[in-house]
Regions:
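Short amphipathic alpha-helical interaction elements located at domain edges
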Residues: 22-51
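A short hydrophobic/aromatic micro-motif that marks alpha-helical segments and, especially, helix-coil
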Residues: 17, 28-31, 231
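Non-catalytic alpha-helical scaffolds and adjoining flexible linkers that form interface surfaces
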Residues: 43-45, 53-273
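Enrichment for repetitive, rod-forming helical segments
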Residues: 9, 29, 168-169
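Generic secondary-structure boundary signal with a strong preference for alpha-helix termini
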Residues: 14, 25-26, 185, 210
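Compact, basic/aliphatic-enriched, mixed alpha/beta core segments that act as assembly/interaction modules
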Residues: 1-25
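Short, leucine/isoleucine-rich alpha-helical interaction segments at C-terminal helix-coil junctions
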Residues: 12-15, 28, 258, 272
Length: 273
């Protein structure tokens, strides 16, 4: 017998990937992510889902059948950046979406090409790190708050990107050490940042470090705040241009070293900004 249950989702724009969260007793809090249709290379209506319940199923397959038909009630299920309530049932090897009620379209992103590609990059980044049978609640919460930040004019998109990347690394257990020297655990004094070493290195330990980046207090404090802050408070500050440039240089090196995939959305984004 097919199991039917209610979900909440946030869609992206590639019709391949959904992230969802299901809570106990049939009600749920979830995010459903779908990447750009033109770049997906999969059948229309097909997706992967992250489901949250007592078993933490992780990534699962899902379908929105007939979503591209004119006047289809499931059109919201495949529109980019939509958040809402989904009803679906579980089949033998996949889940099928039966109905959808969209509560937030994030329409600002659809009207802003650069903002949209930032969003696609975050979704592709998250999909790279999330895995089957994992509890991905924190990553999905980060994605939702990041999409909200992208619709705000008060924080630069580049800062949103660097905050997202650093926090995503932390959620995945790969965040850099920004509170003490990675070698001797010294907590005070002048430090440099080494991506290869995985964080701060004090001047006494940095003699053989070839990739050390000198850090000012403002940049270091910014990184510390991002790592320890709750997700809800991540996008509540701005920084100077100098701090953003330094933070960007650090995260560029860190991503190059620890992210093995080259994201298509990022390639396009870099041609636009």
């Amino acid at each position: 017998m097919k199991e039917e249950y209610w979900e909440q989702f946030m869609t992206t724009g590639r019709i391949a990937d959904y992230l969802s969260y299901k809570a106990e007793s049939g009600s749920s809090e979830s995010r459903c992510l779908e990447e750009q249709k033109e770049q997906a290379g999969v059948r229309s209506g097909e997706s992967d889902c992250f489901d949250r319940d007592g078993a933490f199923h992780g990534k699962i397959s899902s379908f929105a059948r007939g979503a591209r038909r004119p006047n289809s009630p499931l059109v919201g299920a495949v529109n980019p950046f939509s958040f809402g309530e989904f009803t679906m049932y579980e089949g033998r090897s996949s889940h099928t979406i039966q109905s959808v009620k969209i509560t937030n379209y994030f329409s600002e992103l659809r009207e802003d090409m650069i903002g949209a590609y930032y969003g696609f990059y975050f979704l592709e980044f998250a999909n790279y790190y999330t895995k089957e049978q994992n509890d991905e609640r924190e990553m999905l919460k980060l994605l939702y708050q990041t999409m909200k930040a992208l619709t705000s004019p008060h924080i630069p998109n580049l800062l949103i990107r660097r905050i997202f990347e650093l926090k995503a690394f932390c959620i995945n257990g790969e965040g850099p050490q920004v509170f003490q020297c990675v070698r001797c655990q010294k907590k005070d004094g002048q430090m440099v940042f080494s991506a290869r070493e995985g964080g701060l290195v004090c001047t006494d330990c940095a003699r053989n470090i070839s990739d050390g980046i000198s850090l000012d207090n403002s940049t270091l404090y910014t990184m510390q705040y991002i790592e320890i802050s709750t997700i809800e408070k991540l996008y509540t500050f701005t920084v100077s241009r100098e701090v953003l440039e330094k933070l960007s240089g650090i995260m560029e090196r860190y991503c190059l070293l620890y992210v093995e995939k080259r994201f298509k959305s990022l390639e396009i984004l870099e041609t636009l900004v």
